Amino acid sequence: VNLLKKKQLWEEIPPRRNYIDVDNLTKWVQAIIEYKGRGQENETNKDFLLTLILTGLFRNECESLHWKNIDLEEGTLSFINPYNNVYYKIYMGNFLWYLMKKRRIQNKGEWVFPSVKSESGHIINISKFRKKINEQCNLSFTFQDLRRTFYFLLNNLTNKSLVSKRTDQYEEKLDVKNIAHAQDMRNRMNKVEQIILGPYRDELIKSININL
């Protein structure tokens, strides 16, 4: 497994666009937590936005996450980049790991973010919900802004990638070097989580009430 270069396509922040600055992140997270909606759909939409900003995925990548993309034992999320058809793996921070475990307990279907209203079976473009959060926190953001926010923070925290890229079809041996590499990526992802979720991170983890 080789680390991606910082400037590879998947990680680039498109120019001349917005992101949620650090001063407004707490307000944004608070709006998601406090938003009062109905039923499972509301919770799915909230979890989707949090996953988007904590992974840097494109909207369509996150919408179509399948449970086969999630390794709950290892705490990783994998996907194929539609732009270069390459397989990537992200080591989740602890909150996101808890969130995925919670969602799996609640959802035994094939999609991480299911929707009974969609022909595909998973959520598609929840712009109405995004706009409600916009109004609640008095911020204007797009789905792509969440991706840019993640990479803005990542690029200011470290010049190392938080993503692994598989370059061949062989599994790597579980040696000390690889274990240290995985833990390093997890630690850095936790730092990103701490900045994004701020004072709400520990509260959110405690509210899930399950073990990793």
Model regions and ranges:
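Basic, Lys/Arg- and aromatic-enriched nucleic-acid-binding interface segment
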Residues: V1-R59, E63, Q106, R147
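Conserved tyrosine-mediated DNA breakage-rejoining catalytic core shared by Y-recombinases
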Residues: L3-Q8, T55, S64-K101
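Catalytic-site neighborhood detector that most strongly recognizes the C-terminal catalytic loop/helix
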Residues: Y19, N81-N85, T167-I195
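Active-site/catalytic core of tyrosine-dependent DNA strand-transfer enzymes
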Residues: D21-T26, G93-L139, F150
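Conserved short hydrophobic patches within well-ordered secondary structure
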Residues: V29-I32, L54, L153, E193-Y200
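C-terminal catalytic core of tyrosine-transesterase DNA break-rejoin enzymes
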Residues: L50, L54, N60-E61, L146-Y170
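Short, polar N-cap/turn motifs at the start of nucleic acid-interacting alpha helices
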Residues: N69-T76, S140, T158-I179, D202-K206
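C-terminal secondary-structure termini that scaffold catalytic or DNA-interacting sites
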Residues: Q106, S115-S118, H181-L212
